[in-house]
Amino acid sequence: INLMLDAGQKNEVKNILSARTMVRRNGDFLKAIDYTEYFSNEFSEIANELECAAHFATDDLFKDFLGWQAQALLQNNEEMDILADKHWARMQNTPLEFTISRENYEDKLTPTLFENTNLINRLNELNISPVPKDMLGIRVGIVNKKGTDLLLKFKDKMKEFANLMPKSDL
C-alpha cells in the first residue's frame, strides 16, 4: 500500500480498501476490481434467473423487486443496491422471504492496517478509510405468518416495555 501511495496511486488504494472490491496482484502493485465486474458471469446468470422469475410472478411488488435486484447485480452502482432493498422493504405481506444482501463483517486483514501507525496516519491524511470487504448473502424462505404477527405485536409494545426497564428515564 505504501509503495502504491509513493507511486501516486491514491485512487487505486482507496478502491482496494473499499467494501465492494476483489483485490488482485498486478505486477508490483495491487488492483481493485469491483465485484460486479469480477463476478460478472455469475451475477449475469443470477440476474437472468431473477428476470425470468419476474416474468412469471403474479405479485406486482415482488415482480418489481426482482427486476430491481437483477439490475443491482449487473451494475457497478451502490444506489441500485439501495433501490432494490427499498423495493423489498415495501413488500410486507409476501409469503416468501427472499433476500440478496451485502453483509459487512470484520475480517482479519483490515485491522492489520491499523497496527501500522505510519500507514494509517498516511491514509488518514489522504482521507482514505479502510473498510472490511462485503460478502453477498442469499436467503430464501417461507414466512412464518403466526411468528411474524407475534413479532409485530411485540414491536407495537416496545415503547411500553422500554418504560418498564430500570433506568428508563435516562
What function would you assign to each model-found segment?
Residues N2-M4, G8, E45:
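Extended, Lys/Arg-rich, non-catalytic nucleic-acid recognition/anchoring regions
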Residues N11-L170:
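Fold-level signature of zinc-dependent metallopeptidase catalytic domains
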